[in-house]
Amino acid sequence: MIDQKVIVALDYDNQADALAFVDRIDPASCRLKVGKEMFTLFGPDFVRELHKRGFSVFLDLKFHDIPNTCSKAVRAAAELGVWMVNVHASGGERMMTASREILEPYGKDRPLLIGVTVLTSMEQSDLAGIGLDVAPQEQVIRLATLTKNSGLDGVVCSAQESSLLKNELGKEFKLVTPGIRPAGSEQGDQRRIMTPVDAIQAGSDYLVIGRPITQAADPASVLKSINDSLASM
């Protein structure tokens, strides 16, 4: 099976609307991301509905807690059968290691475990506001290195950091990049953005794209256009 690069961010507050959108696209063309709002509103059964339709799911809940609590949440995600789950790297090495170790019994069926470095909406002034006197890129490198040393599969990072992280941490370390906007799209609330082709060329492995697809008149066509552009690289 082709390793789909595009992860469509489902940001709906109505389950019927979300499923109506999902039914317009092909599981062979993308994966789906379910975040905090949808999971809180609709719960695990919504993820199961997506699985029934043949989609792989990135459960984007950014767990951040004491090691025992965080690892049990990660295990619950594995039991749900998701393809990818994430934790905040700022939770530290013990938390991330516990989360990785609890997945070992699942073998090849375990989800990818990804660390969250610096949220793409954050600028240097935001980091200063929480007591971190560092540039976003410096903090990303620090947390990504900690994530790799903890044995996780990769990190969420902006496309601007992808090239640097690939060079620093190796080709096998997966980079999941939000803030992706096909050419001509509005910037939205992501501060550090890039086009799909640019992001893959920079070293990103998976691209999270939301409104440019979910709000398109013909989302299947937009997906095809993006995938075609990536295939022609």
Curated annotation (Swiss-Prot):
Task: List the gene name.
Answer: pyrF
- Positions of disulphide bridges: none
**Mind telling me which Pfam families this protein's record contains?**
OMPdecase
Reaction catalyzed: orotidine 5'-phosphate + H(+) = UMP + CO2
Can you list the GO cellular component terms from the UniProt entry?
cytosol
What name does the UniProt record give this protein? Orotidine 5'-phosphate decarboxylase
Functionally, this protein is described as follows: Catalyzes the decarboxylation of orotidine 5'-monophosphate (OMP) to uridine 5'-monophosphate (UMP).
Q: Active site located where?
A: K62
User: What quaternary arrangement does the UniProt entry report?
Assistant: Homodimer.
Q: For substrate, which residues are the binding ones?
A: 11, 33, 60-69, 120, 181, 190, 210-211
Source species: Vibrio campbellii (strain ATCC BAA-1116)
UniProt KW keywords: Decarboxylase, Lyase, Pyrimidine biosynthesis
